[in-house]
């Protein structure tokens, strides 16, 4: 962190998920590919329109939702690329992605890492499959464990 710059933290809302969980109060829900593309275009335009902040330095970016891992990994990569073109990032900026174990695979995780994500929050919610069903989750505890291992293998060391 450059001592002369003010720390800046960014939140990027990705409102899409596979299906809305019974307990979720966030603005989110399933969306078509066309809706996701339209949202991406609006998000990129919003970043373009944001004020230049040469006196600030990004120390963290958090992608929440919804379930950011439910959308195409390329979309998140393009958003990160746009953010990096607009803002100054600290060398050790924390870039976090919220994820559902039922939406992760090795290819997506490698794309996230390549795009600069260095932290992932994988929502397990419970280690009991029956509870996961009651909560409306789309994964099992075994799928969470597999996703955790895949995230580590992809180089995401903060899981």
Where are these regions (language model features)?
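Generic cytosolic/nucleocytoplasmic N-terminal low-complexity/intrinsically disordered segments
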Residues: 1-3, 19, 63, 85
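N-terminal [4Fe-4S]-dependent radical SAM core
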Residues: 1-11, 26, 54-55
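Short glycine/proline-enriched loop/turn "hinge" motifs that connect secondary-structure elements
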Residues: 4, 15, 150-152
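Structural motif
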Residues: 7-9, 21, 94
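Alpha/beta-hydrolase
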Residues: 12-14, 124
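Local cysteine-cluster metal-coordination motifs and their immediate loop/turn environment
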Residues: 15-28
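Conserved non-cysteine loop/helix-boundary elements of the Radical SAM core domain that shape
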Residues: 28-54, 58-159
């Amino acid at each position: 962190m450059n001592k002369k710059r003010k720390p800046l933290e960014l939140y990027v809302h990705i409102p899409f998920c596979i299906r809305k969980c019974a307990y979720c109060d966030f603005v989110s829900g399933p969306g078509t590919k066309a809706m996701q593309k339209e949202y991406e275009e609006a998000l990129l335009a919003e970043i373009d329109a944001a004020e230049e902040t040469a006196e600030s330095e990004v120390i963290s970016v958090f992608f929440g939702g919804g379930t950011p891992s439910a959308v195409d990994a390329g979309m998140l990569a393009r958003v990160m690329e746009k953010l990096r073109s607009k803002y100054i990032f600290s060398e050790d900026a924390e870039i976090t992605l919220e994820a559902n174990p039922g939406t992760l695979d090795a290819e997506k995780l490698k794309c996230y890492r390549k795009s600069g994500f260095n932290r992932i929050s994988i929502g397990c919610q419970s280690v009991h499959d029956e509870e996961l069903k009651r909560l409306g989750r789309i994964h099992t505890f075994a799928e969470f464990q597999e996703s955790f291992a895949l995230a580590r293998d992809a180089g995401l060391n903060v899981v």
